[in-house]
């Protein structure tokens, strides 16, 4: 009887305070068999609180969504729940953002995949180039130069070209004497002169052509020398007020103590550089050897 009274008091307290606060006391006041069952259920990892039929009925009523207690609980919870909802909403907003960031990074879109794959391929190529460079020992071998085909070949001599005829000294002297006399030979003169020297007419003809070209070059060189000598050596602003050709004025340059007065010969201005426009035998013989 005393146990029933205690149970009733506990039920009243549970109605006032709530079922959850009185649940451990009810389990302690239950029979030892129930305690053993609770211990065995705790060991198995499943919690089944053993309550009286009235308490089970109240729990079932409270578990119904449209019961008075459930509605009262819903009214009380929203006042205390906003922070949790705010936390949940912040977590929910953060998770989509994370998913968005992850989606941007790991999106399987074809454009993203292509853009992401292209630099990787280039990196692979670079790495392969680097490995080949390291394998070669860091020595860069330039690509082999392809030799261009010899399209611009030099002009080849004719195979049927006649060999150069070496003239003797007597022949060269005779040719030089004849060239001084007459630079152009007629056909009859050339035939007679070539037979006298035991040469062909073509050999004599070619020698005279070469000798005329050489004489022209020498004459042009002499004219250039004369032009260079005609230019004044001294600058135009500098001039000597007295001529140095007279022996008296030349002696006055050296002073009165100069005893031996050598007569100074008059020197023409072109005499130092000018040479007679003629051909000596040495030049002619040398030119004949060259031809």
From Swiss-Prot:
Top-level lineage group: Eukaryota
| Residues annotated to bind DNA | 160-219
Predominant location of this chain? nucleus
Q: Which PROSITE patterns match?
A: HOMEOBOX_1, HOMEOBOX_2
Q: Where is this region: Disordered?
A: 36-58, 75-169
Q: Which stretches are tagged as biased composition: Basic residues?
A: 154-164
Q: Could you list this entry's UniProt keywords, alphabetically sorted.
A: Developmental protein, DNA-binding, Homeobox, Nucleus
- List GO BP terms, alphabetically: embryonic morphogenesis; regulation of transcription by RNA polymerase II
Annotated localization: Nucleus
Q: Which family does it belong to?
A: Belongs to the Msh homeobox family.
This chain belongs to the protein called Homeobox protein XHOX-7.1'
User: Which species is listed as the source?
Assistant: Xenopus laevis
- Taxonomic classification, please? Eukaryota, Metazoa, Chordata, Craniata, Vertebrata
